[in-house]
Amino acid sequence: MNVSPNRWEFLLQSLRDLDNSLVQLGSRLFVIKGRPVDILPSLFKEWDITRLSFEPDCEPDCKARDMVITNLAQQAGIEVINRVSHTLYDPETLLMSAGGRVPLQIDAFKELVLLQGRPEMPVATVDRKQFGSCTTPVGEDHKKRFGVPTLEEIVLHKPLTVSSRFYGGGEREALLRLEKALQQVNGLAYCLERNT
């Protein structure tokens, strides 16, 4: 996969942030290294998985992979749950509503979104109660076997220069940037109000 070090670092920071959040809930993030279709079937058995949930991807190659994994899981008697959560609206639903044509102008996109109605309200923040009786099989070899890799481990064949203008990844970083942007907007609104 041809991905820049900046993008890899953003993704890795996001994974580390997610892992830190899960640690606070008594769990961990498991980064599975390798092809999912090769590795997941053995993990289904090793971990006695009964339910698999994942974010559906809209890229054609990823859709094919997801279908194979869904079939493997269902053949193993595992319930499979797909939920769109990285966008306010399901991209596939929007595309179908547009007759399969991607809106090329913002006005056409806004019109399409208005037809969908308001997006669903966000779910509550995950807490320890929601984990219930779930257990996380964290072993002594977790970091080596399932830990978040370093940039050097992923990008072995490229120079590892990350731009100084790089935006950090992760939910905490995103919330900090959002708060800063809202403060700037509020400050601008205050200045405009005083000048009128």
Cite the ranges covered by each PLM segment.
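Glycine/tryptophan-enriched, flexible segments
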Residues: I78, G99-T196
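Trp/Phe/Arg-rich N-terminal binding region typifying the photolyase-homology
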Residues: M1-R128
